[in-house]
Curated annotation (Swiss-Prot):
Coiled coil: none annotated. Residues 42-84 form the CHCH domain. Keywords: Disulfide bond, Mitochondrion, Nucleus, Ribonucleoprotein, Ribosomal protein. Component of the mitochondrial small ribosomal subunit (mt-SSU). Mature mammalian 55S mitochondrial ribosomes consist of a small (28S) and a large (39S) subunit. The 28S small subunit contains a 12S ribosomal RNA (12S mt-rRNA) and 30 different proteins. The 39S large subunit contains a 16S rRNA (16S mt-rRNA), a copy of mitochondrial valine transfer RNA (mt-tRNA(Val)), which plays an integral structural role, and 52 different proteins. The lineage of its organism: Eukaryota, Metazoa, Chordata, Craniata, Vertebrata. This is Small ribosomal subunit protein mS37. Belongs to the mitochondrion-specific ribosomal protein mS37 family. GO terms for biological process: mitochondrial translation. A motif (Cx9C motif 1) lies at residues 45-55. The gene is CHCHD1. A motif (Cx9C motif 2) lies at residues 66-76. SUPFAM superfamilies: Cysteine alpha-hairpin motif (SSF47072). It comes from the Eukaryota.
């Protein structure tokens, strides 16, 4: 285990409650947060799409010969769309456990921090 440097030991020796690190900006919360990027969702229904395209290739791109595969792909796409819709509803209702950035910015604008220490 490394021992602290002489400079750090001397800084703590004079006043043990004084922090050793000196920030270059005051430690005050900002009045807004940055917009986070939405996570990219994973691709859905890849297997159904590949089965449908393989069927099209075998049957010279005739839809009537591949009705079962096309219907399977459309059903999977509809289920994925419903899942995305339910996830977005849960996020807007705040069931995810954290506030969205735009709601947090509105709260921070209503109760701004002082730009100075009092």
């Amino acid at each position: 285990m490394a021992t602290p440097s002489l400079r750090g030991r001397l800084a703590r020796f004079g006043n043990p409650r004084k922090p050793v690190l000196k920030p270059n900006k005051p430690l005050i919360l900002a009045n807004r947060v940055g917009e986070r990027r939405r996570e990219k969702g994973e691709a859905t229904c890849i297997t159904e799409m590949s089965v449908m395209m393989a069927c099209w290739k075998q049957n010279e791109f005739r839809d009537d010969a591949c009705r079962k595969e096309i219907q399977g792909f459309l059903d999977c796409a509809a289920r994925a769309q419903e899942a995305r819709k339910m996830r977005s509803i849960q996020e807007t209702l705040g069931e995810s456990g954290s506030l969205l950035p735009n709601k947090l910015n509105k709260l921070l604008q209503r109760f701004p921090n002082k730009p100075y220490l009092s």
